[in-house]
């Protein structure tokens, strides 16, 4: 059976956890706080709400060998974030840049499928992971380190150790740009990366629909509180063009992400239509940015805007 290669740090953590003795705790809630409207007794005062710490004991540092690091984020899943990450990274490489792509979606890594890559990465004599290479860029993913047919059922400590190894123990060589594909949401992974790694810019991906835009605001709030520059928004699935009659249908609404970007003083890096070719090429392991299709132009535009803002 195939195992995972995050050997030393995570096995030590498992050993520590296995030695812990079970404890029994009784939790009591104040009757005054519990009601039919608020059965959990959650404080309603904004002053008591948890806040993202603005300062940490550790200053964010660049990843060794990497000149610029950007993250691709979506506070909501299913908006095509990984597709944007992959094709933007490939379009940056087409500009002559040395590019790496790091998939830090611990529980749902999809980058290996989109690149048609499998197997386990080799390791250096120093014990660092060597990224796989395809289409001219370096690729590392949690998907290379675990059994692809089994769920990653880890809790906080193991997730933290896995994330630390992906951030610290990969030998990238020398890169002009590292693109990080973040998991959806605004949880521990995003916060840890924002507070420990020097991020030169963030791309936020959204569809035009209102449900996705609500989460965009949460993502923007996270980056503002961690002092991370947002390079702009990508409006994905902006329109569907019928392949038979060329009729345009705005399935998810019209320019919702564009309007949200303008209201927050942000630019729009690009609009990507809902195109079956983009999906099918990703499933085949040959993304449109390298397959030569007309769809590549959308990601080339995004890459142009990113490179201009990064100064690379």
UniProtKB/Swiss-Prot annotation:
Protein function: Required for the effective assembly of the mitochondrial membrane respiratory chain NADH dehydrogenase (Complex I). Probably facilitates the assembly of Fe-S cofactors and subunits of complex I.
First and last residues of the transit peptide: 1-34
Keyword Iron: yes
GO biological process, one term: mitochondrial respiratory chain complex I assembly
Membrane topology, from the record: Peripheral membrane protein
Annotated spans, Disordered: 32-59
SUPFAM superfamilies, per the entry: P-loop containing nucleoside triphosphate hydrolases
Pfam families given in the database record: ParA
Transmembrane segments: none
PANTHER family: IRON-SULFUR PROTEIN NUBPL (PTHR42961:SF2)
InterPro entries named in the record: Mrp-like_CS, Mrp/NBP35_ATP-bd, NUBPL-like, P-loop_NTPase, YlxH/NBP35
Cofactor remark from the record: Binds 1 [4Fe-4S] cluster.
Cellular component aspect of the GO annotation: mitochondrial inner membrane; mitochondrion
Cofactors that this protein relies on: [4Fe-4S] cluster
Example of a GO MF term: ATP-dependent FeS chaperone activity
Family recorded in the similarity comment: Belongs to the Mrp/NBP35 ATP-binding proteins family.
Name used for this protein in its record: Iron-sulfur protein IND1
Keywords associated with the record: ATP-binding, Iron, Iron-sulfur, Membrane, Metal-binding, Mitochondrion, Mitochondrion inner membrane, Nucleotide-binding, Transit peptide
Main location as per UniProt: mitochondrion
Location(s), subcellular: Mitochondrion inner membrane
Annotated ATP binding sites: 75-82
Keyword Transmembrane helix among record annotations: no
